[in-house]
Amino acid sequence: MDQLNVKEQQDFQQIVEQKQMKDFMRLYSNLVSKCFDDCVNDFTSNNLTTKETGCITKCSEKFLKHSERVGQRFQEQNALLMQNMQKR
């Protein structure tokens, strides 16, 4: 990153931010799709039932905890990789 000039650093930062937003939107879309498909079964009303609301809450919490855990493991593996690269 130090080898880049200011303009290149700004461009790189913009690309990173765009990728992060794309990843966030993909995560959100997957969450909505999965929890809706798993929890919403009754289309006779325009309101969610208490059971559906509870299911969506549990589903979204579980999905987000899983995503957080995967992110933590990725960070741990990345840290190990960086340590191994520094030892060389």
Swiss-Prot record:
Comment, domains: The twin CX3C motif contains 4 conserved Cys residues that form 2 disulfide bonds in the mitochondrial intermembrane space. However, during the transit of TIM9 from cytoplasm into mitochondrion, the Cys residues probably coordinate zinc, thereby preventing folding and allowing its transfer across mitochondrial outer membrane.
Motif (Twin CX3C motif): 35-59
Keywords assigned: Chaperone, Disulfide bond, Membrane, Metal-binding, Mitochondrion, Mitochondrion inner membrane, Protein transport, Translocation, Transport, Zinc
Topology of the protein relative to the lipid bilayer: Peripheral membrane protein
A single Gene Ontology CC term: TIM22 mitochondrial import inner membrane insertion complex
Role this protein plays: Mitochondrial intermembrane chaperone that participates in the import and insertion of multi-pass transmembrane proteins into the mitochondrial inner membrane. Also required for the transfer of beta-barrel precursors from the TOM complex to the sorting and assembly machinery (SAM complex) of the outer membrane. Acts as a chaperone-like protein that protects the hydrophobic precursors from aggregation and guide them through the mitochondrial intermembrane space.
Subunit (UniProt): Heterohexamer; composed of 3 copies of TIM9 and 3 copies of TIM10, named soluble 70 kDa complex. Associates with the TIM22 complex, whose core is composed of TIM22 and TIM54. Interacts with the transmembrane regions of multi-pass transmembrane proteins in transit.
Iron is among the record's keywords: no
Domain of life: Eukaryota
Phylogenetic placement of the source organism: Eukaryota, Fungi, Dikarya, Ascomycota, Saccharomycotina
GO terms classed as biological process: protein insertion into mitochondrial inner membrane
Segments traversing the membrane: none
Pfam families reported for this sequence: zf-Tim10_DDP
Annotated protein name in UniProt: Mitochondrial import inner membrane translocase subunit TIM9
Cellular localisation: Mitochondrion inner membrane
Family affiliation: Belongs to the small Tim family.
GO molecular function, one term: unfolded protein binding
Name of the gene encoding the protein in the UniProt record: TIM9
Keyword flag Zinc: yes
Disulphide connectivity of cysteines: 35-59, 39-55
